Structure formats: structure tokens, C-alpha cells
From Swiss-Prot:
The lineage of its organism: Eukaryota, Metazoa, Chordata, Craniata, Vertebrata. The gene is MT-CO2. Cu cation A1 binds at H161, C196, C200, M207. Cu cation A2 binds at C196, E198, C200, H204. Residues 1-14, 88-227 are mitochondrial intermembrane. GO terms for molecular function: copper ion binding; cytochrome-c oxidase activity. Gene3D superfamilies: 1.10.287.90, Cupredoxins - blue copper proteins. It is a multi-pass membrane protein. It comes from Niviventer culturatus. This is Cytochrome c oxidase subunit 2. Keywords: Copper, Electron transport, Magnesium, Membrane, Metal-binding, Mitochondrion, Mitochondrion inner membrane, Respiratory chain, Translocase, Transmembrane, Transmembrane helix, Transport. Residues 46-59 are mitochondrial matrix. Signal peptide: none annotated.
Amino acid sequence: MAYTFQLGLQDATSPIMEELTNFHDHTLMIVFLISSLVLYVISLMLTTKLTHTNTMDAQEVETIWTILPAVILILIALPSLRILYMMDEINNPVLTVKTMGHQWYWSYEYTDYEDLCFDSYMIPTNDLKPGELRLLEVDNRVVLPMELPIRMLISSEDVLHSWAVPSLGLKTDAIPGRLNQATVTSNRPGLFYGQCSEICGSNHSFMPIVLEMVPLKHFENWSASMI
């Protein structure tokens, strides 16, 4: 989860988020090099009085500033496309969970089980226990097995919502009448927090998401107790 005055990304908990973090660092390095080059050229223009008044054309310079941006765009586009395909691909999920956005709560249905569904509301500030997080705790957490591919089917009952868990690299729009999907895979157990990331009305800020990733045996015990 995010902390006060945090400048970087949240710790990656899924393979997708690790790839996104690496892509961020890769792109940031390219942007830093371009910015340094531009600042260097500007500083030369401001500190020197050297001019070349006889230059009518510069084929070499024109070739360089045509090819170099194309190469830079390719260096950014190829890793980006690779990650996009990775995020869209779901191979043999062990579990499917359907998520529906409402004003202003989430409902979840474990489609592989006959009658395992519940609503998830934010816990009001006055009802929080010591150590719990304001505006982030819910009455029913989404319990999922760790280290296994899980398919999330996401939609909405009313207006646009967005189901997002940053540490897992997840952000999928919940659109009425349309079913979007995302892959959830956690490398370690723990609680992972998210929120609705699409303005959906007056209580938009009160739609937290809490995923509880546990070992498979614990998940089986939990699902048996819920049915």
C-alpha cells in the first residue's frame, strides 16, 4: 500500500507489476537522457556566440533528427506492447471471480462455487479497530489463493467504475453492459488495498478494495466455511 510522502511506485507483488516497474524505469531513463541533451543544447545556445551563417542545408543533421526519434519510439513501444499482451493473456485460470461495481460498494461472486457471493462495503471511520486503515478497510475481504492465476471479470450495475489494486498492477474499468477481464497473480501472501479509480458520484472515495492473498489450503478452508 502507499505511504505518506511516498515518491516511488508501490512494491510489486505480481509478475505484471514487476514488468510495469521495469518499464517505468526504462522509460524514465530515456526521458532523462533526452532532457539532458535538450538542456545541454539550450545551455550552448545561451553561453556561446558562435553562428554559421552560410549553412543552407544540413543533410547529416536532418537524417539524425529523423532517425533518432524513430529509434527512441521503437525502444519505448516494443516493451510497452509486450506488457500489454501479457496483461491481456489469461492461461488456464484456477479460479474466476466476478466483480460488480455499484454506487457505492463492490459485490463479488466466485463463479466456480455454487453459492459463494457477497457485498463489500467500506467500514466507517467510527467503527475501525486499532491498526485498521481509514477509508481502506471493508467488511468482507476478497480472499484468493496466492501463486495461482485468477481471472477477474469486472462490470458495473449502474455507472462507470474502475477496479484498481496498484501493488498487483491492476486497473480495469467497470462498464455497465460490458464484461472486462483481468489477471490476478500474487507472489506472496498479505493484504493488498485498492480503490475505485473512476469518479462515480458523491461517495466515489468510499469504495475501497481489499484482497487477502492466502495459501491454497487456507483458501479452501475459507471457501468451505462461506458456503
